[in-house]
Design a protein with these regions (language model features):
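Terminal peptide-recognition signature
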Residues: 22, 67, 86, 130, ...
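Sec-exported extracytoplasmic/periplasmic mature domains
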Residues: 12-16, 37, 41-45, 87-91, ...
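Loop/turn elements at helix/coil->beta-strand transitions in domains of secreted/extracellular proteins
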Residues: 16-20, 64-67, 89-93
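Single conserved hydrophobic/aromatic residue that forms the stacking wall/gate
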Residues: 1-9
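C-terminal structured "cap/appendage" subdomains that terminate the fold
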Residues: 91-151
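Short, glycine-/small-residue-enriched flexible loop/hinge segments at domain edges that mediate gating
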Residues: 18-28
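Extracytoplasmic/secreted proteins, especially bacterial periplasmic and envelope-associated proteins
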Residues: 10, 31, 35, 77, ...
Length: 173
C-alpha cells in the first residue's frame, strides 16, 4: 500500500459496492494492520451533491460502508495482528477459525550461503494493560471451519457465512 491509501481506494476494483469481504486467510504477515485500519475506518460524514444528484460520499478515499474480515488458523505474524486491530477498532466482524497468537516483527538475516535466510523475532506488540499480543489467540466473532470434504468440492463455507452476515448488516441499514 506504499502508493498511498487514496490511490489504493481509487484502484479498489469494487469500491462502488455496498459492502466488502476482506480475506486474510493463509496470510504470512507483512505489516498491513495500520493500512487496513486506515482504509476501512472511514465513517460517512456527508454526501457531495452536484445539481441535485449525489456524486459521492465523504470520506471518498476510505471505505465507509460495511465490511467483514475472514481469518483462519493458518494466519501468521501480522496476519494475526491485522484481524486483531480490525476487531478491536470495531471495524467489523471476524469470521473463520481462531488465529494463534503469532504477532511479532522479525529481523531478516542472510547467512554466508545467501540461500539461507531466516527471521529472528525482535519486536513484540504490547497492549495498554502491559500484556503482549503474542501468544494471545484471536477468536472470531463467528466461528466457522471449512471441512476438507467441502473444500475439495470447491465450496468455501467461511466465505459463504461471511457474505451472508455482511448482507444481513447491509439489509439492516
Amino acid at each position: 500500500l506504499s502508493r498511498g491509501l487514496g490511490d489504493v481506494y481509487k484502484r479498489q476494483k469494487y469500491n462502488d459496492r455496498e459492502g466488502i469481504v476482506i480475506d486474510t486467510r493463509f496470510n504470512g504477515g507483512g505489516r498491513l494492520h495500520e493500512d487496513i485500519e486506515i482504509l476501512f475506518s472511514g465513517k460517512k460524514y456527508f454526501t457531495q451533491v452536484v445539481r441535485g444528484r449525489e456524486a459521492c460520499d465523504m470520506p471518498s478515499r476510505r471505505w465507509n460502508k460495511p465490511s467483514i474480515m475472514l481469518q483462519c488458523e493458518a494466519n501468521y505474524s501480522n496476519a494475526h495482528g491485522t484481524p486483531w486491530v480490525y476487531s478491536h477498532q470495531k471495524l467489523g466482524k471476524l469470521v473463520g477459525m481462531p488465529v494463534p497468537g503469532t504477532m511479532t516483527s522479525v529481523s531478516w538475516e542472510t547467512l554466508q550461503d545467501p540461500s539461507l535466510v531466516f527471521g529472528i523475532p525482535i519486536i513484540g506488540y504490547q497492549l495498554p494493560d502491559g500484556s503482549y499480543l503474542e501468544n494471545t489467540q484471536l477468536e472470531p466473532d463467528i466461528k466457522v471451519a471449512n471441512a476438507p470434504e467441502t473444500v475439495v468440492q470447491g465450496e468455501d463455507t467461511q466465505l459463504k457465512v461471511a457474505v451472508d452476515e455482511l448482507l444481513k448488516e447491509i439489509d439492516g441499514k
